[in-house]
Amino acid sequence: MVTANFAAIAGLSLIAVALVAVFFSPYRRWLGFMLAGMFFWGLLEVVRFGVQVTFEMPVTYSYLTALSLAMVMVTFVLLREDKQAQKALANRQYIEHTPVYEDDQQQCSSR
């Protein structure tokens, strides 16, 4: 059974107070970044543990492998986003060239 000593209770209460203070401050968006970072690190730990158990690697090499896989995935995501941004820019810059007639030319062609 886990026992809570005074230091653990004080530390967790200070973290809770800090989170509440940040939530009500103008820097609320930083909580999203913090949660995304914690989620990313959790996924990294899952990959590290899977690599360590599957290939029986030491902890150091499993961390290096997990970080390498994460960087490769981040690179692929960034390349995909860049390709989509370039495609959207090309679509915005595309101008369809249709003939423009002046009034005189339209009258002549209809006779």
From Swiss-Prot:
Inducers of expression: Both transcription and translation of this gene are induced by treatment with ciprofloxacin (at protein level).
Residues in the Cytoplasmic compartment per record: 27-30, 80-111
Transmembrane regions: 6-26, 31-51, 59-79
Biological-process GO terms, alphabetical: response to antibiotic
Entry annotated with the keyword Phosphoprotein: no
Keywords: Antibiotic resistance, Cell inner membrane, Cell membrane, Membrane, Transmembrane, Transmembrane helix
Membrane topology according to the record: Multi-pass membrane protein
UniProt-listed InterPro entries: AciT (IPR053771)
Subcellular location field: Cell inner membrane
Gene knockout outcome: Increased susceptibility to ciprofloxacin, cells no longer filament in response to ciprofloxacin.
One GO location term (cellular component): plasma membrane
Periplasmic membrane side: 1-5, 52-58
Protein function: May play a role in cellular filamentation, especially in response to ciprofloxacin. Increased expression confers tolerance to the antibiotic ciprofloxacin.
Annotated protein name in UniProt: Ciprofloxacin tolerance protein
Protein's organism: Acinetobacter baumannii
